[in-house]
């Protein structure tokens, strides 16, 4: 896992894989990507952040959910609800049929909520889930419980159930959110860090409401600027025919090689990269542990996906050229010291 993250970081890939229309390079014989319906696009960011979908969602999101996928999904719901520490109850779920129909998926999700003392849970799966707005039915109001359930439908039900119960219990990560008002203008400032923990999501309703109320969302860097990220990737690597070993001491180079091996790479796997690029990457990796989100969706990336899928204007306060230029302009001595310090954990 660390090996894959290292590759992504060194390549300068900081944008989320969670936008509604990802760019896919595929063979002519590959099946067409399965795109989410318009009504589900707004649910993608939270679904991905909570692990309900992964980077490969365009290969299965419109397919009928499998029993294995449903089991994994209900496991995520169970883990999220357990964090609420709600009073438990003896759940009367005997006779509920759990299968891959819409009704079966509703029953599976209801079973997780029925273990807790929640208002309305005693009314049964359909009444409880519709009452929360988890299941909204078709235009005629039908729940279509006998129809096969797509992964997309199950994902949205699970995401809505988690958010509804977290919101009802005033739960979720609040972070550090400031609000400034001047006349008709409102500015929200949210403190973020470029990584997360697996229990960060969902964010508190106050944070999501601030996002919903915003017309423009500004970041340190535009995570959708592919040209900028490509430029940063170029700045990170040597283009003059030299390698890392030509720019740092033999002792420090040996430590870099040892770190590469510990990450499952070849000893010379970092030869193409400059000291500052490696130092930044090792610094991020040193902060990761077993609680780091496995989907690597840092708060910045979550908010970007949320905002883009909602059609909001994206802005940034810096450019990749500006930020990359600062790092690339560091003296050779400073870069070597920076890399040396970042290797303390290896």
Task: Identify the meaning behind each predicted range.
Residues 176-177, 181-346:
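Structured, acidic catalytic/metal-binding patches in enzyme active sites
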Residues 56-60, 168, 267-273:
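Surface-exposed patches in mature extracellular/periplasmic domains of secreted proteins
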Residues 1-27:
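Gram-positive cell-envelope targeting signals
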Residues 28-36, 166-179:
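N-terminal low-complexity, Pro/Thr/Ser-rich intrinsically disordered segments
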Residues 26-78, 88-123, 134-161:
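Extracytoplasmic Gram-positive cell-surface binding/anchoring modules and repeats
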């Amino acid at each position: 896992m660390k090996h894959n993250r290292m590759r992504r970081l060194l390549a300068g890939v900081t944008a989320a894989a969670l936008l509604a229309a990802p760019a896919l390079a595929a063979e002519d014989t590959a099946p067409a990507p399965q795109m989410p319906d318009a009504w589900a696009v707004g649910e993608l960011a939270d679904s991905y952040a909570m692990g309900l979908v992964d980077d490969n969602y365009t290969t299965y999101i419109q397919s009928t959910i499998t029993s294995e996928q449903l089991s994994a999904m209900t496991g995520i719901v169970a883990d999220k609800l357990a964090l609420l520490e709600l009073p438990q109850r003896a759940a009367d779920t005997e006779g509920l049929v759990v299968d891959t129909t819409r009704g079966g998926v509703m029953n599976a999700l209801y079973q997780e909520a029925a273990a807790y003392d929640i208002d309305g849970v005693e009314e049964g799966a359909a009444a409880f889930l519709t009452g929360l707005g988890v299941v909204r039915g078709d235009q005629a109001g039908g729940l279509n419980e006998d129809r096969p359930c797509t992964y997309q439908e199950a994902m949205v039900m699970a995401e809505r159930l988690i958010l509804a119960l977290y919101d009802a219990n005033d739960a979720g990560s609040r972070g550090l959110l400031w609000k400034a008002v001047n006349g008709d203008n409102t500015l929200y400032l949210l403190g973020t860090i470029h990584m997360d923990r697996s229990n960060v999501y969902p964010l508190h309703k106050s944070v999501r409401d601030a996002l919903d109320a915003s017309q423009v969302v500004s970041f340190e860097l535009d995570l959708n600027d592919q040209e900028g990220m490509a430029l940063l990737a170029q700045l990170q690597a040597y283009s003059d025919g030299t390698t890392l070993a030509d720019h740092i001491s033999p002792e420090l180079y040996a430590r870099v090689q040892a770190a590469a091996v510990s990450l499952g790479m070849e000893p010379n796997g970092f030869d193409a990269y400059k000291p500052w690029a490696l130092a930044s990457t090792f610094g991020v990796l040193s902060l990761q542990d077993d609680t780091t989100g496995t989907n690597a969706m840092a708060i910045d990336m979550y908010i970007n996906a949320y905002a883009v899928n909602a059609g909001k204007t994206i802005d940034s306060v810096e450019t990749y050229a500006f930020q990359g230029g600062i790092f690339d302009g560091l003296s050779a001595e400073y870069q070597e010291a920076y890399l040396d310090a970042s290797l303390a954990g290896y």
